[in-house]
């Protein structure tokens, strides 16, 4: 006769594997994110329009080439990220529905761009 633990032991392994696959730091989640690079120079985003697939997380790497700090901000994305002069910042965006999402430099309001999600 098998012990009750022997019957449960295989299930523990399955649950551990499922937990590892769904954890935030797992390779499967990281592979689902799309990385987009954007730079700021002369108080302009380059490119001013960036694209990403729908329903996938987006990592936006913002490289500030200006001599002043900038704040990457988006009301629709609910994001604010200060990027010091001459440095790079990373903005993590949740999976989004298709649409256009405006962003701007809060320190220089004329600096504007759009994330197009398709």
Language-model segments: residues:
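Extracellular/periplasmic metallocenter environments
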Residues: 29-37, 83-118
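C-terminal segment of classical bacterial N-terminal signal peptides
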Residues: 18-27
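Beta-strand-rich interaction surfaces with strong enrichment in secreted/lumenal proteins
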Residues: 48-50, 78-82
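Asparagine-centered strand-capping/turn motif at beta-strand->loop junctions
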Residues: 62-64
């Amino acid at each position: 006769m098998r012990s009750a633990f022997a019957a449960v032991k295989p299930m523990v392994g399955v649950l551990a594997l499922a937990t590892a696959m769904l954890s935030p730091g797992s390779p499967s989640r990281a592979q689902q994110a799309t990385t987009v690079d954007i730079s700021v120079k002369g108080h302009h985003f380059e490119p001013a329009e960036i694209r990403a697939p729908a329903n996938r997380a987006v990592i936006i790497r913002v490289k500030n080439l200006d001599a002043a700090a900038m704040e990457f901000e988006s009301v629709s994305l609910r994001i604010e990220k200060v990027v010091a002069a001459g440095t790079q910042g990373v903005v993590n965006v949740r999976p989004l529905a298709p649409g256009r999402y405006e962003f701007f430099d809060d320190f220089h309001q004329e600096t504007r761009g759009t994330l197009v999600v398709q």
